[in-house]
Amino acid sequence: MAASAGAGAVIAAPDSRRWLWSVLAAALGLLTAGVSALEVYTPKEIFVANGTQGKLTCKFKSTSTTGGLTSVSWSFQPEGADTTVSFFHYSQGQVYLGNYPPFKDRISWAGDLDKKDASINIENMQFIHNGTYICDVKNPPDIVVQPGHIRLYVVEKENLPVFPVWVVVGIVTAVVLGLTLLISMILAVLYRRKNSKRDYTGCSTSESLSPVKQAPRKSPSDTEGLVKSLPSGSHQGPVIYAQLDHSGGHHSDKINKSESVVYADIRKN
């Protein structure tokens, strides 16, 4: 009986260990499912004309559906300051404004949580509104979030950029990429030309510049003249004439020279 009980204990140990691992895995799954990331998108910087309305755009992305627990908070860090001030909060369709004097009676809600939009408007912006604006969104269970930061500049109307900042950034990026591509293509062409010159094994410079003399071509009449005229004082061996007669007549020992016959001059030195 003792032996059987001991065997039962040995068999039960792996079962209990497997059960413990299952519980830990389930708990870890609940923790990771309960807290997920939420992404916030804002422009890096915007320019607003003095005395006009400025819109602070804030979009967010969440895997969870927005509802009564979704909230939006805006805070402000004045230019040159190290601390931030919360001046706006939105939750369950209600707007809660802070007591910060520079924003009194200037803030209005311009977003739509169903469209993942948490933007606000600021009326009659002044130079005191220069600084950094922070957009923070909570949408449980998506609560782990990196807030969006906007650097806002209030300037005179004549100092407003001709193009929006994002357009300027896009143009500069396109120009840099284009120049990089052009330089890469030029370097590739130069590299290929260099390799082609290195692999070429043709004639040398002196050989390529040496003129090539070709012997003049002789016509049948020139051959006949060569037979008639021989250099004076030179030793001449026997000359043999060969005549090809295509007329079909009888053979003759007499050589009749004509324009249609080619004569061969064979000399023996």
Curated annotation (Swiss-Prot):
Q: Where in the cell is it found?
A: Membrane
Q: Which residues form the signal peptide?
A: 1-35
Q: Which cysteines are joined by disulfide bonds?
A: 58-135
User: Mainly localized where?
Assistant: membrane
Residues with Phosphotyrosine modification: 241, 263
| The encoding gene | MPZL1
Topological domains on the Cytoplasmic side lie at 184-269
Cellular component terms per the entry's GO annotation? cell surface; focal adhesion; plasma membrane
Q: Please name the GO terms that the record assigns under molecular function.
A: structural molecule activity
Intervals of motif ITIM motif 2: 261-266
Query: Ranges in the Extracellular compartment?
Result: 36-162
User: What result follows from mutating residue 241 to F?
Assistant: Significantly decreases phosphorylation. Complete loss of phosphorylation
Query: Which superkingdom, per the lineage?
Result: Eukaryota
Q: In which tissues is it expressed?
A: Widely expressed with highest levels in heart, placenta, kidney and pancreas. Isoform 3 is relatively abundant in hematopoietic tissues and fetal liver. Isoform 1 and isoform 3 are expressed in CD14- PB monocytes and pre-B cell progenitors. Isoform 3 appears to be the major isoform in CD34- promyelocytic and promonocytic cells. During differentiation in monocytic cells, the expression level of isoform 3 decreases and that of isoform 1 increases. Isoform 1 is prominent in stromal cells and, to a lesser extent, in umbilical vein endothelial cells and erythroid progenitors.
Which residue ranges have biased composition labelled Polar residues?
A: 202-211
Entry note about domains:
Contains 2 copies of a cytoplasmic motif that is referred to as the immunoreceptor tyrosine-based inhibitor motif (ITIM). This motif is involved in modulation of cellular responses. The phosphorylated ITIM motif can bind the SH2 domain of several SH2-containing phosphatases.
* Annotated PROSITE patterns: IG_LIKE
Give the UniProt keywords, A-Z: Disulfide bond, Glycoprotein, Immunoglobulin domain, Membrane, Phosphoprotein, Signal, Transmembrane, Transmembrane helix
Biological process GO annotation list? cell surface receptor protein tyrosine kinase signaling pathway; cell-cell signaling
**Protein name per UniProt:** Myelin protein zero-like protein 1
Motif ITIM motif 1, per the record, lies over: 239-244
